[in-house]
Amino acid sequence: MYMLRPSSLLLATGLLNQGSSVLAAVISRASNQTFDYVIVGGGTAGLVLANRLTEDSSVTVAVVEAGTFPEDVVGNVTQVPAYAPQFEGAELDLEWNFTTTPQAGLGNIPVSYYRAKALGGCSDINFMAYGRTSKGAHQLWADLVGDDSYTYDNMVKYYKKTMNFSPPNAETRLANATPMYDTVDTSTGGGIDVTFPSFAQSWSTWVSKGLAAIGLPQAHSFVDGNLLGHSWQMVGITQSTGIRSSAQAGYLRPVMSRPNLTILNGTFAERIIFNGDAASGVEVTAKGQTYTLTSKKELILSAGVFQSPQLLMVSGVGPKALLDKFNIPVVKDLPGVGQNMVDHITVPLSYQVDVVTSSTLAGSSLEEAITEWNTHGTGPLSNNGGDYIGMEKAPAEFRANFSAETVKQLSALPEDWPELQYNVLPATVSSTSIGGEGSVLGGNYGSMLASVIAPQSRGNVSIASASMSDAPLINPNIFTAQADIDLLLTAFKRVRQALQSSAMAPIMIGDEFFPGPTVQTDEQILDYLTETVRPFSHGFATCKMGKSSDPDAVIDSHGKVYGIKNLRVVDASSFPFLPPGPAPQIQVYTLAEKLADDIKQTKY
């Protein structure tokens, strides 16, 4: 995805109060051990499972995580909401630094694909967006997997278990930045602190006018099962401190002292151990030593959209032809492992504007912002940068130009599934410099991302060898389906309509900054899209959930791997599709909450 990467913020971390890293001292060392449950991956899903399963004091749980607390790598930088944009491509030991295979839809170039390597996973470094998916998407989910427990009404209780909501701070937000939401859709006491940023971007107040001008209705913060419209964005931030609320902050730290929970950081899963057709544990390495962790009840893979299928394949569960290629003994021929990968796609547009944005947050203004955040948890650093969002179906005048195949594919989606998404970014975004250059260019800049959230392109994840030490082969295959081309062209034009509307004219300075006024014809726009489009790093569905009759299904509706006992997959790879919404993180939290209950109720 395109992200802001303000160089001024990268240089300012030393001015922040450094968060404590003493928690690392209580992390256990790897050794041959036996637990009731072993969870591979201490990310967004894995830590939810660890928290909920250890609520039963008679149950022992180990979490295997290659990373550590992000504070041990970059101090407290990940805790600061405004710093979220700097992590993609930063090449810190906080990410896996994956690169895709050459992408046919992008002129055969590879692109970076960021995945966190840390306790908390991508919840440590993403944009913290919080929102549910649509009611229709839930019904489709239930239908595809043959399980009505996935309908919206049945999943609401799990959504609410993820949320500890605090109302917006009206004293610190702009007077014209009051969010709309219904308290019936919120809850307290859940794992993640959720609120609206204490600081509202002026740029976003104007974008709201632009989106209204092109016909988007006002929405209620996207936590009511309706995704069509525009709204201020709920985020995973602690209202009282202005600190990011992640899986490790909300689900792990509060239960670190539980004696039945063991965290094995700096530990790499190498191979699933089988006893016949049952998983019995996992072979891991830590500091050059190899150990065996035995799971008496279940082994649960929560290693993410790339490494959960990779671990299955190197262990002998996957497409037989691929396993044979690397002389991997076949435990179970499951053709769907690593298939069906899907991701949202996006391109940016930028303008110079007559309101203060983050593009000029440097020097004394940055020092003031740091002081305010350290003292009160408010100000520009308490804002994640993407605090406003719009979603819609492509309007009729654009649909008239869609290909017949596009129309057919989109007609299969629920009526309430938006196809296009528009995100704000309070700085410039270009192909050569991702944000933060306002102080160099002179002036303030604002951007919007034009995105497709009903993508039809499908990719895959494969293996390069029989070893987890070799990175997986990641082929999202983005921008290859004609539907995605039709939709992204529409999204681009709709963003232009909003930003060039009379409603936004009072703050716009000059012509479009990026890609610029010379990009006008459909051919020119398509050239720009091909050169610039990127995945959102929202990869899903590589261990697809589905009915036993679905040849691509890897797991059933309980997360259990078909044909293998005592083995589940619970993470972004588990979904039957990539659900629409502000961002899919909350769907992963919610699935983990649901399947934690399922695991607790399983009789062994």
Swiss-Prot record:
The enzyme's E.C. designation: 1.1.-.-
Binding-site residues, FAD: 44-45, 65-66, 126-129, 572, 584-585
Record-annotated active site: 538 (proton acceptor)
Residues of this chain annotated as glycosylated in UniProt: 32, 76, 97, 260, 265, 401, 460
Annotated SUPFAM superfamilies: FAD-linked reductases, C-terminal domain, FAD/NAD(P)-binding domain
Pfam families reported in the protein's UniProt record: GMC_oxred_C, GMC_oxred_N
Uppermost EC category: oxidoreductase
Disulfide bond residue pairs: none
InterPro entries in alphabetical order: FAD/NAD-bd_sf, GMC_OxRdtase, GMC_OxRdtase_N, GMC_OxRtase_C
Keywords: FAD, Flavoprotein, Glycoprotein, Oxidoreductase, Signal
Key word Iron present: no
Cofactor(s) recorded in Swiss-Prot or TrEMBL: FAD
Signal peptide annotation: 1-24
Domain of life: Eukaryota
Recorded family membership: Belongs to the GMC oxidoreductase family.
PANTHER family per record: DEHYDROGENASE PKFF-RELATED, GLUCOSE-METHANOL-CHOLINE GMC OXIDOREDUCTASE
Record's function text: Oxidoreductase; part of the gene cluster that mediates the biosynthesis of the phthalide-terpenoid hybrid 11'-O-desmethylfendlerol. MfmG seems not to be involved directly in the biosynthesis of 11'-O-desmethylfendlerol and its role has still to be determined. The biosynthesis of 11'-O-desmethylfendlerol begins with the NR-PKS mfmB that forms 3,5-dimethylorsellinic acid (DMOA), which is then transformed into the phthalide 5,7-dihydroxy-4-(hydroxymethyl)-6-methylphthalide by the cytochrome P450 monooxygenase mfmA and the hydrolase mfmC.
Record's subunit section: Homodimer.
Protein name per the record: Glucose-methanol-choline family oxidoreductase mfmG
Origin species: Annulohypoxylon moriforme (Filamentous fungus)
